[in-house]
């Protein structure tokens, strides 16, 4: 009996943040995007009175992959003078893009492209299962990266390479449309409760929807990433170079703190009914 009780998880919590519904990333590496937008989702539900609401993950993931493709190709142009066995060049070709990420990527994408409700741009097979299409896109990017280096070796100017990149990005965009659908530029929406509109439907752009319905919060200014990395000194700020989602965006920036400090902040966040975003690397021992 004792062993059975020990195996039963304790589901009692002293404090709960009001939320509703579970967002499912399926077989994709988009945990960072789901968790990041869930912070805003709870705020939208509280602001509108809706009992359930979801953002379109396919919308922001489309632009995530578009921006990462540009980040890679621009990186190839920036390193065109370096030998092919240069560590940075090797890293670029080994990691042209991924479906993973972190909160600075969420904030940069939302700031640039806004947000849309799930019903405006639904999930597709490829967005729920990212591995297959991601492999195709990586292959295309590596091919284009080599073409840019070859053009540079033949004397192409930086301006000519930039134009070549624009043409390559058109193909990338078309591939993404086939996989995830074409992102909307405007849509009509209004909050619903029990299947009925609570106000007159209004036309939004993704950017105006984020500002007017979601509050338009400056995520980069109002949120910080905390990390517990015992291998590095605590109480210091760390930045991981080139770990970003957009070329002109923010690198992964975090404050390294003892786990006891992070626990205190997490508890304070929950008591304030503010969702605390959590990334973790679980192991069989956890």
Task: Report the location of each language-model feature.
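Generic signal for short, ordered secondary-structure residues
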Residues: 10-11, 88-89, 245
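Aromatic-residue-lined binding/catalytic grooves and analogous aromatic/hydrophobic interfacial grooves
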Residues: 143-244, 252-255
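Active-site acidic/histidine clusters and adjacent loop/turn architecture
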Residues: 239-243, 247-276
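Conserved small/polar residues in nucleotide/adenosyl-binding loops
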Residues: 279-286
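Active-site nucleophile-adjacent alpha helix/oxyanion-hole segment immediately C-terminal to the catalytic cysteine
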Residues: 16-79, 84-97, 101-160, 164-183, ...
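N-terminal regions that are enriched for targeting/export leaders
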Residues: 1-17
